């Protein structure tokens, strides 16, 4: 929680509890701000129960996991209270995190949208050799008949071909970064989207 994060502590501990506030939406601002000074690998980020015990807010299970995956991911809930479907979803979420863990621990971070300043949060992690990347975004509040949200990735190799998942399309890095990707957020508040990029 508060005041546990200071630069000197990293001499003794590689990972710190980022905040006692584990609300999926609140964590976008908490993690965004913390990342200005500390590596994502040092930020302990947990998926917790809903309604959240600090804010009373309900956020989708998938969204809580997507935001937690932008740090050292864990779970803070009682597995005995989970349904069979939720347990299966956790297994899928853990597999997703394992696939991107190398980017969390050693990739380059690009902050695309600041949730404190706009109704949008987006961060992108890119491998040092630009061979792969992941982009995660959250739209906190749903907007009726709102404009399309276009995300502009950064840090890709302009001349390389990338497969974009889950769309299963192949585009040049330059095209992806300049034309952008339309973000199809799930209906409702606090929806997230995640895109993976792999050199084709």
Per-segment meaning from a language model:
Residues 1-9, 83-87, 110-118:
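A glycine-rich phosphate-binding loop feature that marks nucleotide/adenosyl-phosphate handling sites
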Residues 1-81:
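Glycan-recognition surfaces
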Residues 10, 81-82, 147-152:
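Composition- and surface-driven signal marking solvent-exposed, interaction-prone regions
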Residues 68, 135, 164:
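Conserved, mostly hydrophobic/aromatic
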Residues 71-72, 77-113:
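Aromatic- and carboxylate-lined catalytic core of secreted/periplasmic carbohydrate-active enzymes
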Residues 114-158:
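Carbohydrate-binding surface patches
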Residues 154-169:
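Solvent-exposed beta-hairpin/edge-strand motifs
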Residues 173-200:
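C-terminal beta-strand-rich structural cap/linker in extracellular carbohydrate-active enzymes
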């Amino acid at each position: 929680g508060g005041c546990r994060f200071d630069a000197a502590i990293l001499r003794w501990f590689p990972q710190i509890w980022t905040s006692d506030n584990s609300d999926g939406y609140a964590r976008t601002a908490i993690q965004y701000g913390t990342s200005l000074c500390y590596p994502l690998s040092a930020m302990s980020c947990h998926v917790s129960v809903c309604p959240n015990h600090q804010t009373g807010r309900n956020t989708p299970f998938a969204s809580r996991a997507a935001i937690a995956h932008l740090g050292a991911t864990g779970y803070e809930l009682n597995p005995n209270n989970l349904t069979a479907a939720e347990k299966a979803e956790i297994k899928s979420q853990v597999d997703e995190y394992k696939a991107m863990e190398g980017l969390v621990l050693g990739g380059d971070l690009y902050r695309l949208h600041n949730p404190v300043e706009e109704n949008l949060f987006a961060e992108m992690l890119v491998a040092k050799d630009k061979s792969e990347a992941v982009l995660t975004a959250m739209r906190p509040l749903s907007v009726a008949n709102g404009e399309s949200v276009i995300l502009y990735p950064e840090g890709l190799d302009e001349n390389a071909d990338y497969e974009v998942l889950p769309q299963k399309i192949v585009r040049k890095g330059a095209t992806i970064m300049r034309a952008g990707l339309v973000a199809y957020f799930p209906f409702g508040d606090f929806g997230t989207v995640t895109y993976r990029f792999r050199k084709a």
